[in-house]
Amino acid sequence: VAFSTLIQTQSYPKTKSHFKMLEQDISDIIDKAIVDRNKEVKKRTYIGASSLGDSCSRKIQYRYMGQPVDDNRDFDAKTLRIFQFGHEIEFSVAGWLRQAGFDLRVEDKNGEQFGFSIAEGEVKGHIDGVICNGPLDTAYPMLWECKSANEKKFKEFQTKGVAVANPVYAAQVALYQAYMQLTDNPCLFTVLNKNTSEIYYEFIPFNKALAQEISDKAVVILEATKANEMLPRIAQSRDYFACKYCEFQDSCWSS
């Protein structure tokens, strides 16, 4: 049965300009749907452990306080698609590890993502997974964290390692190892190149000093917020590199 017999047909112009207009329309419709869905997601009321490695404690404090982001600073559809793509990559890499014989677990017995909660629930973290066994001649269990990167950043991971290429990730790993009690064995950190699908692997031993430093940082943020005190800005000018791309730039520098 032809589809044309199943629906009421209407006549539309078939010019090149008309189709160009439709192409823009569908782009706008999909982008709006993605952004609208994101607005429905419940905002965090706690400090995400993955963010504690950020160099600006004041930004983390703003997020914890539920400060609305500045006008036109919300994530756009393109950025939200990048985030979603990251989740899909994580799912794929997990599957490849299992195919290779690794006993990778990403959920507890209740089907919930592995994670931890400290400071009476004011700080929480959710890990990508735990490798309990596998074909490598090494000790288990070990934390598994998965990221993705473009070509330029991927090369940086390869040449400099996680601690230098992305200190936020390094802090995240140390904190997760500490509070998930996975300190005996290194974390397996994987990064997939979004341009070539090449995968970078790095074993990251537990950094006790870094974990303590980040834990202390969380305490400072919590105590300052409880006392209704704003932590210092990271810079002397709003034109500082980190401030230029901060979602709270206007709020921070106008106060």
Tell me the role of every PLM-derived stretch.
Residues 73-74, 154-160, 200-201:
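Short acidic, glycine/proline-rich loop/turn micro-motifs
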Residues 163-170, 175-255:
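Metal-dependent nuclease catalytic regions and adjoining charged, substrate-binding loops involved
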